[in-house]
């Protein structure tokens, strides 16, 4: 009798999940920990279903899912010349919207749905904040406008499709692209964006 085995469904690369806790008395470096590395679909779902969704995290916590060889830090060599596509989830949105946006982009990322531009993507970040949470896709080269715009278009398409299936309204109003160096040097809450894509034109 042949024993049935669970399909492995390997991913094309290793991904690491990092968690930033909300300990206000600790340094940022001490708060950030790598908690899991996965490279198959079953490994991903086993971990994902065992943890809290973003909406269940405390204020000031972050989830980061990055290629295993890249740390989720601006100063990392792979990130310093890069930027991010930023989605702001206003506090008026329901918790389900935050979780839906996070999962939709996460599945697109580990499923290699950005095609040849996957090599330009470093990882995905969710910053849980009381005044409005942020989800961002980090890219390697902020000056590669064509690649970054293609990534943004795929993001928009994925989120618009997800909204049409399960939500009566778009999951986002606008997504922006900004450079990491601009974020690091910011002196006000107003940041310059290189590109913006609206959910409804």
From Swiss-Prot:
Q: Does the keyword Protein biosynthesis apply?
A: yes
Instruction: List the SUPFAM superfamilies.
Output: eIF4e-like
Q: What keywords does the record list, in alphabetical order?
A: Disulfide bond, Initiation factor, Protein biosynthesis, RNA-binding, Translation regulation
Which cysteines form disulfides?
122-126
Q: Which domain of life is it from?
A: Eukaryota
> InterPro entries, from UniProt?
TIF_eIF4e-like, TIF_eIF_4E, TIF_eIF_4E_CS
Which GO cellular component terms, listed alphabetically, does the Swiss-Prot or TrEMBL entry include? Answer: eukaryotic translation initiation factor 4F complex
Q: Which GO terms describe its biological process?
A: embryo development ending in birth or egg hatching; regulation of translation; translational initiation
Summarize tissue expression. Answer: Enriched in the germline.
Q: Could you say which protein family the record assigns here?
A: Belongs to the eukaryotic initiation factor 4E family.
- Protein name per its UniProtKB record: Eukaryotic translation initiation factor 4E-5
Gene name for this UniProt entry: ife-5
């Amino acid at each position: 009798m042949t024993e049935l085995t669970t399909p492995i469904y390997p991913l094309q690369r290793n991904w690491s999940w990092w968690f930033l806790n909300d300990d206000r008395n600790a340094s940022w470096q001490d708060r950030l920990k790598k908690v899991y590395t996965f490279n198959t679909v079953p490994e991903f779902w086993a971990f994902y279903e065992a943890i809290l969704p973003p909406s269940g995290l405390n204020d000031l916590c972050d989830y980061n899912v990055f290629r295993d060889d890249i740390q989720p830090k601006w100063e990392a060599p792979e990130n310093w010349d890069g930027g991010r596509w930023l989605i702001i989830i206003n506090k008026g949105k329901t918790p389900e919207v935050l979780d839906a946006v996070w999962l939709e982009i996460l599945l697109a990322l580990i499923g290699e749905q950005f095609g040849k531009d996957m090599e330009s993507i470093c990882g995905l970040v969710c910053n849980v904040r009381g005044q409005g949470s942020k989800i961002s896709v980090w890219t390697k080269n902020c000056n590669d406008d064509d690649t970054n715009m293609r990534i943004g278009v795929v993001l928009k398409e994925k989120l618009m499709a997800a909204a049409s299936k399960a939500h009566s309204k778009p999951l986002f109003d606008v997504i922006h692209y900004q450079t990491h160096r601009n974020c690091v040097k910011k002196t006000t809450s107003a940041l310059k964006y290189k590109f913006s894509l609206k959910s409804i034109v």
